[in-house]
Every structure is written in C-alpha cells, then in structure tokens.
Design a protein with these regions (language model features):
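Generic intrinsically disordered, low-complexity segments enriched for polar/acidic and small residues
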Residues: 4, 27-29, 184, 208
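N-terminal signal peptide c-region/cleavage motif recognized by signal peptidases
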Residues: 33-35
Length: 234
C-alpha cells in the first residue's frame, strides 16, 4: 500500500480545525545559487536557496479528492568543517510531521549515496511556508533528496518539471498514490513535464496525459535526476 503525504491546519478552536489530506509531489522551481568553489577558509560558507512547488491531493468541501499546489523551501549551506550533516526542519510558519521528516532524511541520504557525494559539511533547512499547517507523508521525499543533490552540485532543476515518489533502499523511485490528481494539479499550474514512479499504485484510477504536457515514468534515481536537470546523477 503506497504511503500518502498530507497536511493538517492547526486552529485555536479545536472544533473548527479543518483537516486536509495531501499526497505531495514536488516539481522544481526556483534555484538561486552562489557558488564558492575553491574558496579559502576565511570566506563565507556556500549558500543556496530552492523553492519547490509541491503537488498534492486534498479533500474539497464535498470530501472529494482534488489536486493542489503547495511549496517547500530548502536552504542549503556548505560549511568549511566536516562535522556531519545537519538537517533541520523549521516549525514556523508550518511544520513537518515526524514521519515526513524521517522520509526526507532517508531520501537525502540515499540520493547522496547514489551520487557519490559526501554530505558531512552540509547544513540543510526545510520550511513549509503555510501558517498553522503540518505536512505529512513521504511522496515529496525523492524530489527533496534530488533537489538537495542538485544544489550541492550547482546544477539547476529545469523550470516546470516535477517528481513524485520516494527513494527505495536499492536506489529506485518508490511507488506513491494519487497520480491522476497530481497530473491535473501540475497541468493547472502550467508545468510541462512531471516524473512519476514507473510502478503504478493499485489504488489509482486510469488517467490521460493532458494536452501539451509530458508525464514520464522513471524507475531509477539517475533517470529521475536526468529528467529534472538534464544532467547525470554521478
């Protein structure tokens, strides 16, 4: 059974707290980088910021699933020391559930391993910029992991492209659900290509690719990374 990603919104009135269930994907974005290759030890650390559009599935007022777009912001810092990866999840404006945090942490580690990158000098901050909202699930994790790799390598994610899925232990894109709704949400936001797991979730209905949009099934991290950046993972 594939895992889903979602969020809930906190309220000061418990009886009025709405609950949204989301299956998130990530599509990429805006990448701002300031490389400092070969910088001496007294120079500032290398810093990048990436805002990732997130596609998901929520319930409308009639409790029917619909696609939705949110964002996650990644701040990446490459330090001069090698004291270990520091991964921090901000709690304001929104926050990440423990399960989402673990999924993201695992995906980053597996993406770095596949790319043969040492991450012991990195500090990464993740922000969910929606007041009072908590993100749940794991289907954003592959996009976050590969986005961090792209930031470390100084490679851009092509605007209008996105990925939904997890990263499995053997380095493949893991199955997630809600693909038909995610495709429609991506189309509504004028994304031109999304990458989905090659293995389909059994609960998903049949769907058709919208006009002028490309949906690409991928099964390996290298194929997913190439689809997002136009570069090889290693």
């Amino acid at each position: 059974m594939p895992h889903h990603t979602g969020f809930t919104k906190r309220s000061t009135r418990r009886s009025e707290t709405p609950i949204l269930v989301i299956s998130l994907i990530c599509a990429g974005i805006f990448l701002f980088s300031m490389p400092a290759r070969g910088a001496p030890a007294n120079t500032p650390p290398e810093f990048h910021q990436l805002a990732i559009p997130i596609l998901g599935v929520t319930l409308n007022q009639q409790h029917h699933p619909v696609g939705i777009v949110t964002h996650v912001v990644i701040n990446f810092e490459k330090r001069h020391d090698h004291d270990g990866l520091q991964l921090r999840f901000r709690v304001d404006p929104g926050r990440f559930s423990p399960y989402a945090q673990q999924a993201i942490s695992t995906a980053i580690a597996r993406a770095c391993k596949a790319a043969n990158l040492q991450n012991d000098s990195w500090t990464i901050y993740l922000t969910f910029p929606y007041h009072g909202v908590t993100m749940y699930g794991d289907s954003l994790s592959a996009m976050v992991g590969l986005s961090v790799v792209a930031m470390a390598k100084g490679e851009d994610i092509i605007f209008g492209r996105s990925l939904t899925g997890t990263i499995t232990e053997d380095g493949h894109i893991g199955t997630v659900g809600g693909i038909p709704y995610k495709v429609q949400a991506a189309y509504a936001e004028h994304m031109n290509r999304i990458l989905i797991p090659e293995e389909r979730a059994t609960a998903d209905d049949e769907w058709q690719t919208p006009f002028m949009m490309q949906v690409s099934p991928v099964n390996t991290l290298d194929k997913a990374y190439y689809g997002l950046t136009g570069h090889r993972l290693e």
